[in-house]
Amino acid sequence: GYVREGEGLVQALSATAASGPFREIGAVRCRKTKGNRIVPLGAMFFLEIAAGVPMTKSVEVINASEAMDARRKDLLSDRGLKDKTVALLGAGSLGSKVGLLLSEAGVGRFLVVDRDHLDVANLSRHACDVADVGRSKAMAVAELVQRRLVASEAIDVDIVALDDPTLDAMLASVDLAVSTTDSPACQFTVNEACLRTGTAGLFAGAYERACGGEVVLVQPGNSPCLFCAVGFRADISEVAPEERRKAYQSADAQQLMAEPGLGADLAYLSAIATAYALAVLDPTGMRAALASPE
C-alpha cells in the first residue's frame, strides 16, 4: 500500500477485496507533506489478499530504502547518493526522465523548478501520466521522484525572473544543477549562477525532431562554461547547422514552440545526461571518469 495523506502514524488503513471493503488497524509510517515539501518517513506496507479474503496476519512493514539499496550494491560508492541534492531546472519531458533516473539511482533530495503545467500533448514523452494533466510540472515531478522514497520540493517559478541572490542561494544549497529547459536565456542564467556559486551544472537539450542532442557539463574552475562550450560546438559537430538548432526554439532563439520528437529518443539522451550527473554526484564511483577534466 501507499499512504498519500496524513502525518506521522496512520492508525487505520482501508482496502477492497472480492469480499468487500475491510479495514486493518495498525501503525504504519507514511510520508508527510508540508506545502510543496514532501518528506518520506521510511516505510511501506504490504497486505496480502488470498482468494479475495484479506489475510491480516500477512501485513508486513519493511525498510524500503534498504531493500532498494540491495539492487544498487557495488554500483555506487559506499556512501551512495542519499546525502546528495539535485536541482532540476526544467521539469519537462527530458527533465522528468532525468529526475526519475536519478531518484532510482538513490539521490536523496530534489529541488524541482518549472513554471509550466502538464497538458495532454506532453503525455507522449513526459515521465508523468494522465493523472497529472493540468497540474504544475514542478509538483508532478516532485511527487514522481518522491515515489522512489526521496525528499523533494517543488517551486513554480520562471527561473529567468529570479534575482541573482535568490537563484544563487538556491544553487548554493545543491550538489548539482541539472538544466533541461529549452530557453537559451534560462540556460545562460543558470550557467552564470553556477559560475558565481561554484556549483556544478549539467545542461542537456534535444535538437530538432530529437535527431540528436547535447549534454554539457560545467564544473566551475575545471571546465569551460556553457557559453564557451556552445561557441566551440559548431567546429566539432558533425550535425548540420539546421538540424543542430535546439528543439522548441525558433530561429531567433526567443520564442518557444512545440516540436515533434519521440520519447524513445529523449530517453537515450536522458540516459547519457544521467550518467554524467552520477559521475559528479559519486566522484569515487564507476562513472567518475566522465566528470574528469582530463
Residue ranges and their predicted role:
Residues 115-151:
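Glycine-rich phosphate-binding loop and adjoining beta1-alpha1-beta2 segment
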Residues 83-84, 92, 123-127, 255-262:
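Glycine- and acidic
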Residues 141-176, 181-185:
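A structured beta-alpha segment of the ubiquitous adenosine-cofactor-binding alpha/beta core
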